[in-house]
Swiss-Prot record:
Record organism: Cuphea hookeriana
Span list, region Disordered: 1-81
GO MF annotation, one: fatty acyl-[ACP] hydrolase activity
SUPFAM superfamilies: Thioesterase/thiol ester dehydrase-isomerase
Chief subcellular location: plastid
The protein's Enzyme Commission number: 3.1.2.-
Catalytic site: N314, H316, C351
Pfam families, per the entry: Acyl-ACP_TE, Acyl-ACP_TE_C, Acyl-thio_N
Biased composition (Low complexity): 1-16, 24-41
Stated name of the protein: Palmitoyl-acyl carrier protein thioesterase, chloroplastic
Keywords: Chloroplast, Fatty acid biosynthesis, Fatty acid metabolism, Hydrolase, Lipid biosynthesis, Lipid metabolism, Plastid, Transit peptide
Cellular component, GO, one term: chloroplast
Length: 415
């Protein structure tokens, strides 16, 4: 019916009683040409017809007198000659038809049920990733861009860390737990609570190169009474080779007071259904990080300040930025000849916009093998500790120093 109404605005339909031969006065004339007017018989008296056709409503002529002669009233009420302009469609009818079409389409759209039927069918329509493994694992692919590689044509450690952070946030979003778009559940939002990372461990088996496509799988699990663990596996999309393993521990902080908080029961009820009962993909490195200061450090870089773009929506420096600052004090000869293969960071406090920091690095004498190990400290000028860390390095194009944990600790087969 909508299509008929729309088409009738462009092409008026003929009346059912239309005839091709000349008929009595009131029937549709056989020709509308104003160049050849015809006369109409009426009781033996012939009167030349006006060039204009009788007015019509719904295809039937109306408003004519029973006699063939026109009265003075008829002469004044006769319509103007039919021209190209006055034979255009009725735009009000056309507008009404278009409006009807759009309203019908909108109604059909709203009636569709877009809710996923199964947890493993949760898919982001914008291509940000998908939920797999019975709704417990989030998967997303990334292509390595030219601006994400370093001098050796491989992805930087910052690129890897950005992929970890992006998938963590998208996981919360696609699972329907994000209230403000940045990792907070509705109950967390009500209580001004945010997630902050307490510890991060990363093991890199191989860095992808420009043009490679990597697949990132991530999931969450319980960590103690008031913590949450998030694990990642990064693999090569073409070969399935595991490139990177990462594990982290997160705790809650009140956004207004900037103090750590216990997980409220309401928040726990939101997140626990998404927990995976699985050990971490990396064995926890519980070695105590030694104290580092000016006397014990081999290299110190001072005067580091955050830029505006280094802040996240929680108004503190993004945790990925800390890695770049830590590497600022790493010896240049190490950066040129070796690559980072293992990273452990312990976050002590947040860093704000006005902070001025110092980066301290010392060689770890306990490190063995053919690579290097370093202790790191990122602190404020007044001595307050921001991040403590340990890094392990291997010769470039070499293999990782030590055994990479097998996939037995992952929650399932992700193929």
């Amino acid at each position: 019916m909508v299509a008929t109404a729309a088409s009738s605005a462009f092409f008026p339909l003929p009346s059912a009683d239309t005839s091709s031969r000349p008929g009595k006065l009131g029937n549709k004339p056989s020709s509308l040409s104003p160049l050849k007017p015809k006369s109409t018989p009426n009781g033996g008296l012939q009167v030349k017809a006006n060039a204009s056709a009788p007015p019509k409503i719904n295809g039937s002529p109306v408003g004519l007198k029973s006699g063939g002669l026109k009265t003075q009233e008829d002469a004044h009420s006769a319509p103007p000659p039919r021209t190209f302009i006055n034979q255009l469609p009725d735009w009000s009818m056309l507008l009404a038809a278009i409006t009807t079409v759009f309203l019908a389409a909108e109604k059909q759209w709203m009636m569709l049920d877009w809710k996923p039927k199964r947890p493993d069918m949760l898919v982001d329509p914008f291509g940000l990733g998908s939920i797999v493994q019975d709704g417990l694992v989030f998967r997303q692919n990334f292509s390595i861009r030219s601006y994400e590689i370093g001098a050796d044509r491989t992805a930087s450690i910052e690129t890897v860390m950005n992929h970890l952070q992006e998938t963590a946030l998208n996981h919360v979003k696609i699972a329907g737990l994000s209230n403000d778009g940045f990792g907070r559940t509705p109950e967390m939002y009500k209580r001004d609570l945010i997630w902050v990372v307490a510890k991060m461990q990363v093991m890199v088996n191989r860095y992808p190169t420009w043009g490679d496509t990597v697949e990132v799988n991530t999931w969450v699990a319980k960590s103690g009474k008031n913590g949450m663990r998030r694990d990642w596996l990064i693999s090569d999309c073409n070969t399935g080779e595991i490139l990177t393993r990462a594990s982290s521990v997160w705790v809650m902080m009140n956004q207004k007071t900037r103090r750590l908080s216990k997980i409220p029961d309401e928040v726990r009820n939101e997140i626990e259904p998404h927990f995976v009962d699985s050990p971490p993909v990396i064995e926890d490195d519980d070695r105590k990080l030694p104290k580092l200061d000016e006397k014990t450090a081999d290299s110190i870089r001072k005067g580091l300040t955050p830029r505006w773009n280094d802040l996240d929506v929680n108004q503190h420096v993004n945790n990925v930025k800390y890695i770049g600052w830590i590497l600022e004090s790493t010896p240049p000869e190490v950066l040129e000849t070796q690559e980072l293969c293992s990273l452990t960071l312990e976050y002590r406090r947040e860093c704000g916009r006005e902070s001025v920091l110092e980066s301290l690095t010392a060689m770890d004498p306990s490190g063995g093998g053919y690579g290097s190990q370093f202790q790191h400290l990122l602190r404020l000028e007044d001595g307050g500790e921001i991040v403590k860390g340990r890094t392990e390095w291997r010769p470039k194009n070499g293999v990782i120093n030590g055994v990479v944990p097998t996939g037995e600790s992952s929650p399932g087969d992700y193929s």
